Amino acid sequence: MLSVAILAAGKGTRMESSLPKVLHKISGKSLLQRVIDSCAELKPDKIFVITGHKSKEVQKSIPKDKKIHVVVQEPQSGTGHAIQVLCSEVKKHEGKLLVLNGDVPLIRPTTLKRLLYLHDSKNADVSLITTKKTNPHGYGRVFLNGDFIERIVEEKDCNELERENPLINAGVYCFNWGNLSEIINTLQSNNNQKEIYLTDTISLLKNSLSLEVEDNGELQGINNRIHLSECEECIQNSIKEKHMLNGVTFINKASCSISEEAEIGKDVIIEANTHIRGNTKINSHCIIGPNTFIENSNVGLQCEISNSTVYDSQVMDHIKIGPYSHIRPNSKISSYSKIGNFVEIKNSQLEEETKVNHLSYIGDSIIGRSTNIGAGTITANFDGQKKYQTKIGKNSSIGANTVFVAPINLGESVTTGAGSVITKDSKDNSLAISRTKQVNIENWKKKKS
């Protein structure tokens, strides 16, 4: 039986934030969620998330899962105290207990599996991950006696000689839970921090082993915004390298960010300052960017999107969008269409070969195929209380500066006169025009200021 305890109770004061440290995000996921995801790959029987500081806020972020249980640590008196609280709330202490911090977002499931294997194969009481750092400042130092761990001394309790030891405690432990539960309540806060250290269990358990791993960044704990940025960069480099090896070109990869869920086809070019978020799929032979943001959207084959934003929408094949277009949620732009500069599309469906080239707002609308929308066209869809739909049939030609006051339904091959305010439905093959007759007054004298 395997149980996991994730320590997520700390204040994270060095983050200088009102947000709990474990809720800060890297590439769209919180630190805590990343640790939960890594642990879930071990297929544990239970995952305990130990919260404390702003516990309710942290609990709201935890996914609903029968295997995940929340334990509240009050007050927060150290890592050893956290496990004391856990042991007091859980009646059966069976099998193995894996303990790790909620601020190590890069920890790999393969590394955790290696720790579990070492623990089982050596029948250890406790096994923990260690690594050597050229600058071990801030970490507890691990002292070995042959193959066994003799003791761990926290940074603030080290003397000058002990501080020279480069072998540090990564804060990832695997315990025989039964043996741990027998000694956990004997831990005391006899240290400079006046906290109960989990590391003090090492000297109380007989068979304590170390799994030394290479310092490759996966054990980096997040203590400040610099660490957060470094981990973000590490994850982003990994994501972008994967895509480049699969045939994607980044013009300036350092200026771009890509979500882990995103799918990008071959021969796609990602220009500078482009950000692809969420469950976005970009098919082959597209040019995306520069200065473009796409989130939770599907982009078809051979599309070009520049200096624009696309949210929760479908962009089909052979479409050009931008510059300075805004495609808002629940929109579908069908193939061979063109969305030009300063155009906003919201909750609308544009059929094939539709053009909206300039300075227009299309909201809550259905636009038929091969329709041309003139510059300055507005679908006035809101009466102050409710939103209404505009329908325009295929092969229509909408004059510049037309305003449609919804709800309204235009047939196929309809033409509207420039500057019209259309308030009534129009049949197929009709001209809709609504504007006052022009009056020219000769010899007009301007008013003097």
Swiss-Prot record:
> Which keywords, in A-to-Z order, does the entry hold?
Acyltransferase, Cell shape, Cell wall biogenesis/degradation, Cytoplasm, Magnesium, Metal-binding, Multifunctional enzyme, Nucleotidyltransferase, Peptidoglycan synthesis, Repeat, Transferase
Offer one example of a GO biological process linked to this entry.
regulation of cell shape
Q: Which InterPro entries match?
A: Bifunctional_GlmU, GlmU-like, GlmU_C_LbH, Hexapep, MobA-like_NTP_Trfase, Nucleotide-diphossugar_trans, Trimer_LpxA-like_sf
Show the Gene3D superfamilies listed in the entry: Hexapeptide repeat proteins, Spore Coat Polysaccharide Biosynthesis Protein SpsA, Chain A
Q: Which enzyme type, at the first EC level?
A: transferase
Listed binding positions for UDP-N-acetyl-alpha-D-glucosamine are 7-10, 21, 73, 78-79, 140, 154, 169, 223, 328, 346, 361, 372
Which region ranges are annotated with the description Pyrophosphorylase? 1-225
Q: How is the cofactor bound?
A: Binds 1 Mg(2+) ion per subunit.
Stretches the record annotates as N-acetyltransferase: 247-449
One Pfam match, by short name? NTP_transf_3
Q: Tell me how this protein assembles.
A: Homotrimer.
Q: What is this protein called?
A: Bifunctional protein GlmU
Q: Which species does the entry assign this protein to?
A: Prochlorococcus marinus (strain AS9601)
Gene encoding it?
A: glmU
